[in-house]
A protein has these predicted regions:
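Gly/Gly-Pro- and Ser/Thr-rich, intrinsically disordered tail segments characteristic of DNA damage-repair
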Residues: 1-117, 138, 239, 288, ...
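Phosphate/anion-contacting hairpin/loop surfaces
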Residues: 71-182, 187-190, 194, 199
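Compositionally biased, low-complexity segments
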Residues: 294, 311-315, 334
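Intrinsically disordered, low-complexity segments enriched in serine/threonine/proline/glycine
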Residues: 299, 308-318
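Basic, nucleic-acid-binding surfaces and adjacent catalytic neighborhoods in DNA/RNA-processing proteins
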Residues: 23-42, 55, 60, 147-303, ...
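Generic alpha-helix initiation/capping and coil-helix boundary signal
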Residues: 166, 196, 310, 320-322, ...
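Intrinsic disorder/low-complexity detector
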Residues: 76, 97, 176, 264, ...
């Protein structure tokens, strides 16, 4: 699912393409794409409205319309937005079309049909329950600490909770925890002030870098102006079996809170207080004792503990991951071609 950097990239690509245009009509090909409104009422609500701006809140795109109303677009798993000419080739996966007054149209393409589009008036606040924006100036270390210390959950599910902080998903939660050297099963209450500061810094640093690199084009994500490149700079996400960039030990993959989670069990130590309860014991049973707590230097075979040439098993894992990335890139290219984008 596209996260903050990917959605921000789509917003930045979309804004100059459609800002100032007027919506002439809307055609809905999959009624469930709409959130709480019928296709007829949606078309009536957007027809004749001028697009005043495009922004983002968390993982959702906000299209501001004249008259004070606005659209929200949640891409979910496979949602894509393209701006093409109205006489462009048809595509069976296009779920909704906004016809513009200049001969172009905005197409919402969504293979798995999970994406949602809503229409709201100025008085509505569909984002009331969403947490603060992690890249905003208001998201200070003090704010982060206060919110963190009010929670008792484990770090990985906590970072995915959109009421805690907006926009972080599976990719950047794994990356931030690895960069901060914090185990995904660690609980918020066990963090020291230095841990809190490190996690806050890494969340902001990694998200900012990902925005600059146009996000991670993994699976079906692509933006109107093309793919991102952050996927080539991820340290642990979808790299199970590959060597940890810090210590050379293989990256582990487990399921935490129903989500695939990638981490280094040697670099990201789990305190004894966090090894029992809350599902941790079940997950840890799949790991050896050194993997649970992280290996000590004395337990490493000679020559290990540093990054070096990958072993055969890791080479296989790396090759498999590369094939997966290439297949996803092929799907994204096919999507752009199918809509004439």
């Amino acid at each position: 699912m596209p996260e903050l950097p990917e959605v921000e990239t789509v917003v930045r690509d979309l804004r100059p393409l459609i800002a100032g245009a007027t919506i002439v009509d809307a055609t809905t090909h999959w009624a469930r794409t709409l959130r709480g409104i019928t296709p007829e009422l949606f078309a009536d609500g957007v027809a004749g409205r001028r697009i005043e701006g495009v922004s983002r809140r968390g993982k959702q795109i906000v299209v501001e319309l004249s008259g004070g109303s606005f659209l929200t677009i949640h891409l979910k798993m496979t949602g894509q937005l393209f701006v093409v000419r109205q006489d462009g080739p048809g595509d069976p996966y296009v779920r909704l079309v906004l016809e513009l007054d200049d001969g172009r149209e905005v197409r919402f393409r969504d293979i798995r049909k999970f994406g949602k589009i809503g229409l709201y008036v100025a008085a509505d606040d569909p984002f009331a329950a969403i947490g603060p924006e992690p890249l905003s100036d208001a998201f200070t270390l003090g704010v982060f600490r206060k919110r963190l210390r009010a929670r008792k959950g484990r770090l990985k599910p906590l970072l995915l909770d959109q009421t805690f902080v907006a926009g972080i998903g599976n990719i950047y939660a794994d990356e931030a925890l690895w960069a901060a050297r914090l185990h995904p099963l660690r609980t918020a209450r066990t963090l020291r002030p230095a841990d809190e500061r490190r996690l806050w810094l890494e969340i902001r640093r990694i998200l900012a870098e990902a925005v600059i690199r146009r996000g991670s084009s993994i699976d079906d994500y692509t933006a109107p102006d093309g793919d991102g490149e952050m996927q080539d700079h991820l340290q642990v996400y979808q790299r199970a079996g590959e060597p940890c960039p810090r210590c050379g030990r293989p990256i582990r993959r487990v399921v935490v809170g129903g989500r695939a989670t990638h981490f280094c069990s040697w670099c990201q130590r789990l305190p004894a207080a966090d090894r029992a309860g809350g599902g941790a014991a079940t997950i840890l049973r799949t790991m050896t004792t050194p993997e649970r707590r992280g290996r000590r230097w004395s337990e490493l075979p000679a020559g290990e503990g540093r990054v070096g040439p990958a072993e055969d098993g890791r080479s296989v894992a790396s090759s498999r991951a590369e094939r997966t990335r290439r297949a996803a890139a092929t799907r994204r290219a096919a999507a752009r071609a199918s809509v004439g984008g």
